[in-house]
């Protein structure tokens, strides 16, 4: 039987810190971020289906979100200002991500590749699925900014402003719902969210 390094690689996502050029009150790794993106993407898909006549598979979208940054175990987490410095760098980095996604898929035993490829290879996602995962990704980065700012870390002010523009570009009814219903709690203390829950 062959051995696969696929999950050994993925387990190292917890060693890759996000926001590497910024001071963080609490560091966030890619593994944690991926879990939060999966939870938010799942919620966005459910909201779209329940409130706005969507026809998405929330569980599939959650799994796509789990793997949305998996290629970073091979590429690292390139800071956003570098990744999008200009169109040429952004284009070349997309090509690198695609190669890394395919390398991850090739690490799997042959009989599992067809099951994982649609989750890891973003080119196999529908436009609607991609939109939900990208919304969730931006929302989670925005929530990180809110948490850092609530802890007194003004290092995240510019990132928050940039992400507000990104969220406006990716705006949808399900995102508006999520922002209105769930996001305000992220600026509250544990005591405040605990009191309202009782």
Swiss-Prot record:
<feature type="site" description="Appears to be important in orienting the phosphate for catalysis">
    <location>
        <position position="18"/>
    </location>
</feature>
<dbReference type="InterPro" id="IPR006674">
    <property type="entry name" value="HD_domain"/>
</dbReference>
<dbReference type="InterPro" id="IPR003607">
    <property type="entry name" value="HD/PDEase_dom"/>
</dbReference>
<feature type="binding site">
    <location>
        <position position="33"/>
    </location>
    <ligand>
        <name>substrate</name>
    </ligand>
</feature>
<feature type="domain" description="HD">
    <location>
        <begin position="30"/>
        <end position="142"/>
    </location>
</feature>
<feature type="binding site">
    <location>
        <position position="137"/>
    </location>
    <ligand>
        <name>a divalent metal cation</name>
    </ligand>
</feature>
<keyword id="KW-0479">Metal-binding</keyword>
<feature type="binding site">
    <location>
        <position position="137"/>
    </location>
    <ligand>
        <name>substrate</name>
    </ligand>
</feature>
<protein>
    <recommendedName>
        <fullName>5'-deoxynucleotidase ETA_12010</fullName>
        <ecNumber>3.1.3.89</ecNumber>
    </recommendedName>
</protein>
<feature type="binding site">
    <location>
        <position position="69"/>
    </location>
    <ligand>
        <name>substrate</name>
    </ligand>
</feature>
<keyword id="KW-0963">Cytoplasm</keyword>
<dbReference type="GO" id="GO:0005737">
    <property type="term" value="C:cytoplasm"/>
</dbReference>
<keyword id="KW-0547">Nucleotide-binding</keyword>
<feature type="binding site">
    <location>
        <position position="68"/>
    </location>
    <ligand>
        <name>a divalent metal cation</name>
    </ligand>
</feature>
<dbReference type="GO" id="GO:0002953">
    <property type="term" value="F:5'-deoxynucleotidase activity"/>
</dbReference>
<comment type="subunit">
    <text>Homodimer.</text>
</comment>
<feature type="binding site">
    <location>
        <position position="69"/>
    </location>
    <ligand>
        <name>a divalent metal cation</name>
    </ligand>
</feature>
<comment type="similarity">
    <text>Belongs to the 5DNU family.</text>
</comment>
<dbReference type="GO" id="GO:0046872">
    <property type="term" value="F:metal ion binding"/>
</dbReference>
<keyword id="KW-0378">Hydrolase</keyword>
<dbReference type="GO" id="GO:0000166">
    <property type="term" value="F:nucleotide binding"/>
</dbReference>
<feature type="binding site">
    <location>
        <position position="33"/>
    </location>
    <ligand>
        <name>a divalent metal cation</name>
    </ligand>
</feature>
<comment type="function">
    <text>Catalyzes the strictly specific dephosphorylation of 2'-deoxyribonucleoside 5'-monophosphates.</text>
</comment>
<dbReference type="Pfam" id="PF12917">
    <property type="entry name" value="YfbR-like"/>
</dbReference>
<feature type="binding site">
    <location>
        <begin position="18"/>
        <end position="19"/>
    </location>
    <ligand>
        <name>substrate</name>
    </ligand>
</feature>
<dbReference type="InterPro" id="IPR022971">
    <property type="entry name" value="YfbR"/>
</dbReference>
<dbReference type="InterPro" id="IPR039356">
    <property type="entry name" value="YfbR/HDDC2"/>
</dbReference>
<feature type="binding site">
    <location>
        <begin position="77"/>
        <end position="80"/>
    </location>
    <ligand>
        <name>substrate</name>
    </ligand>
</feature>
């Amino acid at each position: 039987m062959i051995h696969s390094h696929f999950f050994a690689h993925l387990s190292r996502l917890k060693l890759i810190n996000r926001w590497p050029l910024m001071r963080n009150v609490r560091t966030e790794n890619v593994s944690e971020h991926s879990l939060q993106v999966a939870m938010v993407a799942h919620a966005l898909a459910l909201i779209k289906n329940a409130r706005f006549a969507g026809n998405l598979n929330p569980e599939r979208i959650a799994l796509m979100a789990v793997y949305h940054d998996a290629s970073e175990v091979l590429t690292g987490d390139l800071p956003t200002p570098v990744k999008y410095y200009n169109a040429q760098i952004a284009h070349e980095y997309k090509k690198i991500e695609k190669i890394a996604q395919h390398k991850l898929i090739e690490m799997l035993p042959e009989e599992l590749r067809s099951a994982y490829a649609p989750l890891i290879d973003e080119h196999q996602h529908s436009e609607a699925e991609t939109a939900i995962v990208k919304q969730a990704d931006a929302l989670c980065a925005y929530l990180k900014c809110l948490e850092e700012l609530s802890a007194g870390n003004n290092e995240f002010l510019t990132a928050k402003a940039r992400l507000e523009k990104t969220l406006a570009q990716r705006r949808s009814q399900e995102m508006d719902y999520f922002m209105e219903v769930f996001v305000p709690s992220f600026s509250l203390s544990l005591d405040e969210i605990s009191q309202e829950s009782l």
